[in-house]
């Protein structure tokens, strides 16, 4: 990865029993993570940083930028934030793809398609 983000400082849905076995793509889990002011502040600053970096990487000839997002289990917070960045970049005309490397390594009982499934 070119950029690595650690989102373990965000509130963890794992400790909410009804969210424990749902991924960060499930709307109620996403809404929980996004309901905290710290999440909104982080997203604003993170999006601004990536928006600043993209044209600078392109100017240096970099045709691809890999952003890794991690948390404790790779199921809730990192998934939610990776999805948010995916949507932000896509909505701003960036050719973007997303992969959740660790989501199925967990005891996921409920998942959702995420933003990549949207047209």
Name every feature range the model reports, one short phrase each.
Residues 1-65, 90, 104-107, 111-119:
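C-terminal accessory "lid"/substrate-recognition subdomains
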Residues 63-86:
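Catalytic cysteine-centered active loop of the rhodanese-like fold, especially the PTP/DSP P-loop
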Residues 86-96:
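Post-Walker A helix-loop "phosphate-sensing" segment adjacent to the P-loop in P-loop NTPases
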Residues 94-105:
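Short beta-strand-centered segment that lines the nucleotide-binding/catalytic pocket of NTP-utilizing
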């Amino acid at each position: 990865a070119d950029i690595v983000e650690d989102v373990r400082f965000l509130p963890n849905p794992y400790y909410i029993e009804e969210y424990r076995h749902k991924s960060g793509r499930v709307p109620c889990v996403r809404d929980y993570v996004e309901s905290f002011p710290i999440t909104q502040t982080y997203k604003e600053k993170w999006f601004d940083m990536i928006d600043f970096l993209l044209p600078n990487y392109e100017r240096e000839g970099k045709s691809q930028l890999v952003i890794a997002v991690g948390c404790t289990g790779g199921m809730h917070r990192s998934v939610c934030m990776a999805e948010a960045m995916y949507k932000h970049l896509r909505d701003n005309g960036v050719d973007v793809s997303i992969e959740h490397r660790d989501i199925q390594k967990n005891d996921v009982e409920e998942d959702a398609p995420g933003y990549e499934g949207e047209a």
